[in-house]
Amino acid sequence: FDAALIVDEAHATGIFGKSGRGLVHELGLCNQVFARIITFGKGMGTHGAAVLGSEQLRTYLINFSRSFIYTTASSFLSHLAVKVAYEFLKKHDHQTMIHERIKQFKIKVNSAINLLPSNSTIQIILVPGNTQAREAAIKIQQAGFDVKAILSPTVAIGTERLRICLHNHNSIDEINKLCTTINQIL
């Protein structure tokens, strides 16, 4: 097909790979993808993004990307924040902590619940039907948890879901309480 693979690592940067370099890096596939889009706003806790690719791609984007041509460079403070975030990941056990929380969530959710396979901080539970997904999300929110329903037409009919985002600032006790709530409601 003469196609090129571009990988969006928005939810992998800071979470997967050595020092948070992403899932493509963790899998050793950096030289097999055309470009990687990494963001600094999720796992890195700052803002901005970068496109990683070949020198040819870099030259192309500099010369033909209208939004790049007509914008100003990011500030020194933005660059410093990203640098400090990467240094933090090298010095702290952030990745082990978040993966422990993900594992705890997956263990504690009832096996009868339709939890999609994921090692990411984003966990998805299928709750078919807009009404059913919305009502489940509301009940979980009323218990104090920020769980969102993703409804059709955003997703295909019959694949409506709950989106759960896990963070390092969630304690194991909070995750256990969330799972207990989910198990009771679903």
What are these regions (language model features)?
Residues 97-103, 110-143, 154, 166-168:
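Conserved PLP-binding catalytic core of the aspartate aminotransferase-like
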Residues 25-60:
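Active-site PLP attachment segment
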Residues 1-2, 11-35:
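Active-site pre-lysine segment of PLP-dependent enzymes
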Residues 47-48, 64-74:
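A short glycine-threonine-serine/GTX helix/turn-capping micro-motif
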